[in-house]
């Protein structure tokens, strides 16, 4: 499988899984994907995730989606910085998603974190995606 945007693929799997009301989805594992899922879990957008060994050298992420009263917790999730057009943001220019109701996930020199954590740490970085 040759993917030019692995993170975009995982976000699409999450979006499609929520639309289909699936409780669990899978995605190939990587450090970046795991770090993004950790932020989503910490912010309460997914129930959890774990890494499964499919065979030696191949690992998958098992992502448990979250619903509130039958409706998906994630209303919107989309990629901002793409392989063909990277989007970087200074601390002063960090985006506010729906006036603070959603989050932006950033890749910073201190690791992957939400926009609120980046403001608290006073760091900018690449805006990976927005979640609402």
From Swiss-Prot:
Part of the 30S ribosomal subunit. Contacts proteins S5 and S12. Keywords: Ribonucleoprotein, Ribosomal protein, RNA-binding, rRNA-binding. PROSITE patterns: RIBOSOMAL_S8. The keyword RNA-binding applies. One of its GO terms (cellular component) is ribonucleoprotein complex. Pfam families: Ribosomal_S8 (PF00410). It comes from Rhodospirillum centenum (strain ATCC 51521 / SW). InterPro entries: Ribosomal_uS8, Ribosomal_uS8_CS, Ribosomal_uS8_sf. NCBIfam families: PRK00136.1. Belongs to the universal ribosomal protein uS8 family. One of the primary rRNA binding proteins, it binds directly to 16S rRNA central domain where it helps coordinate assembly of the platform of the 30S subunit. GO terms for molecular function: rRNA binding; structural constituent of ribosome. The lineage of its organism: Bacteria, Pseudomonadati, Pseudomonadota, Alphaproteobacteria, Rhodospirillales. GO terms for biological process: translation. This is Small ribosomal subunit protein uS8. It comes from the Bacteria.
């Amino acid at each position: 499988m040759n993917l030019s945007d692995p993170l975009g693929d995982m976000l699409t799997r999450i979006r499609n899984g929520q639309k289909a009301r699936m409780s669990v989805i899978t995605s190939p594992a990587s450090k970046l994907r795991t770090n993004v899922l950790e932020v989503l879990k910490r912010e309460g957008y997914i129930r959890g995730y774990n890494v499964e060994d499919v065979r030696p050298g191949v690992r998958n992420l098992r992502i448990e989606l979250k619903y509130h009263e039958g409706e998906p917790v994630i209303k919107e999730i989309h990629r901002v910085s793409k392989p063909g057009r990277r989007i970087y943001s200074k601390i002063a220019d960090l985006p506010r998603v729906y006036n603070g109701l959603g989050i932006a996930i950033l890749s910073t020199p201190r690791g992957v974190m939400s926009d609120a954590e980046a403001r608290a740490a006073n760091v900018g970085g690449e805006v990976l995606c927005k979640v609402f």
